[in-house]
Regions:
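Hydrophobic alpha-helical scaffolding
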Residues: 15-16, 45-48, 84, 171-172, ...
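Acidic, glycine-rich loop-and-beta core segments that form the ion-binding/anion-interacting portion
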Residues: 78-150
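Glycine-rich hexapeptide-repeat left-handed beta-helix
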Residues: 131-267
Length: 267
């Protein structure tokens, strides 16, 4: 409408906020003798954002819509008001999301997966029937295959994790490629940063990493290899090998009694 541009030039910022309101065109059109019609819209669709309170209100509206859409498409949100989604989140059929979960941009969750409470996921792709959390953090670049388990207080970043693999507790997996059916024991750390650059850890199919292990990248653990608990691995381990770096156990009989006597001996 050519007249629209004419009226736009006449709109003034003569209101308490000093803003230009497009809706002032209605008054100008009426004054010019034009016929004016209106369509009733959802209030939230045309609401303005003048402060952080307005922004929070509209964010809540958006979150409600995203939650409802996810549930209508087959996901179960146990306490919907506590789950936060992103506009581009893709959630498969029969996914269960427990309370207090945050899903950031670029996340895809495969069908039948379970996201347990207090987990944070962003920039990640999960296959079918994964179990995540509680208290898990999946950072950008995480790509988990079908049936992967990432448990409590586990953090992943820029890592591919093969089908059926699991890291159930207290683990950091960064810049890694993990094969299928790998077990990563509690307290395992992929030491990917030397203060200057990031390096890759590779763990091949069916390897088993013992608890409290440090894998100093770049390093490769071969298929079927076993890493003993408490080891620090700084070199590649061949397929089906067992690698340990623990010191020998030193047991001193009755030494605890002598130690206590020395500590509490009157001066």
């Amino acid at each position: 409408c050519p007249l629209l541009f004419t009226w736009l030039e006449q709109v003034q910022a003569n209101n308490k906020n000093g803003e230009i309101y497009l809706t002032d065109i209605v008054e100008l059109a009426t004054q010019a003798g034009s016929k004016v019609a209106c369509q009733i819209a959802d209030e939230a669709e045309i609401a303005g954002v003048n402060d952080r309170a307005d922004l929070a209100y509209l964010e809540a509206v958006l979150q409600t819509r995203l939650r409802n859409s996810a549930m209508q498409q087959g996901a179960s949100l146990i306490a919907p008001e506590t789950v936060f989604l992103n506009a581009d989140t893709i959630i498969g059929q029969d996914v269960i999301i427990e309370p207090h979960v945050v899903i950031g941009p670029g996340t895809q969750i495969g069908e039948g997966s379970i996201i347990k409470s207090f987990s944070h996921i962003e920039g990640s792709k999960l296959g079918a029937c994964c179990v995540i959390g509680p208290y898990a953090r999946l950072r950008a670049g995480t790509d988990a295959g079908d049936g992967v388990k990432i448990g409590n207080f586990v953090e992943t970043k820029k890592s591919t994790i093969g089908a059926g693999s699991k890291a159930n507790h207290l683990t950091y997996i960064g810049d890694s490629v993990i094969g299928a059916d790998v077990n990563v024991g509690a307290g395992t750390i992929t030491c990917n940063y030397d203060g200057f650059g990031k390096f890759k850890t590779i763990i091949e199919d069916e390897a088993s990493i013992g608890s409290n292990t440090a894998l100093v990248a770049p390093v490769k653990i071969g298929a079927g290899a076993i890493i003993g608990a408490g080891s620090t691995i700084t070199a590649d381990v061949p397929n089906d090998a067992i690698a340990t770096t623990r010191s020998a156990l030193d047991v001193r009989q009755n030494a605890a009694i002598r130690y206590r006597n020395q500590r509490y001996e009157p001066s």
